[in-house]
Design a protein with these regions (language model features):
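Anionic N-terminal interaction surfaces
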Residues: 2-110
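Acidic, Ser/Thr- and proline-rich intrinsically disordered linker/docking segments
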Residues: 3-11, 88, 125-191
């Protein structure tokens, strides 16, 4: 570590602690572990702090809270309903809508990712890629990115969300809709 780092109290230990916190957060997300919230919150409040600015970590913690709330609703077969008149939704029910970009597209268009009862669809840019749930092999989430992989393909569509909450909740809803389509369900009860 350099002289400036030592003078201003920056140590490699802070970087290690921040990395360890993010790994703990990722495990809590994967396990849907509500009990981990208190420990993650306490770790953010330690002195010295994990980082000079904890805004991203606080956003990640809030995203985990939102995901846990959503998972309770999904377990009870309650999907969120989003009122929209967007033409790409058509007669489908819309269960998620978030601003996204497509970082792998050369034009890097921005628009909205809409998760409907029958498909994931991007509204923005010059084209409107859509992936029907029955043709979706996998939904992956990493940081603020969502990747929808089509059945029979090695590639997919990557969407970059503006927040961790949108990425986590969008992935959870997409997986729920994908599983429902595989079971042959066209609509999940909205009670």
């Amino acid at each position: 570590m350099g002289l400036l780092g030592r003078l201003f109290g920056r140590t490699s230990n802070n970087g290690d602690r921040a990395h360890a916190w993010r790994e703990s957060w990722a495990r809590a997300v994967e396990a849907r572990d509500a009990a981990a919230l208190a420990g993650l919150e306490a770790a953010l409040r330690q002195t010295p702090p994990l980082a000079d600015d904890l805004e991203i970590e606080e956003e990640m913690l809030d995203a985990l809270r939102q995901l846990l709330d959503l998972e309770r609703d999904l377990a009870a077969a309650r999907l969120p309903l989003v009122d929209t008149t967007h033409r790409v939704v058509g007669a489908d029910r819309c269960h998620f809508s978030a601003p996204v970009s497509m970082p792998d597209d050369p034009a890097q268009p921005t628009g909205r990712l809409l998760l409907t009862s029958s498909r994931a669809v991007f509204a923005g840019g010059s084209r409107t890629p859509a992936v029907p749930w029955h043709a979706t092999r996998e939904v992956l989430q990493r940081d603020r990115d969502l990747l929808f992989v089509r059945a029979g393909a090695d590639e997919g569509y990557r969407f970059r969300c503006n927040s961790f909450a949108d990425a986590l909740c969008g992935a959870a809803i997409a997986r729920h809709l994908m599983r429902s389509a595989r079971k042959g369900l066209t609509h999940t009860p909205d009670s």
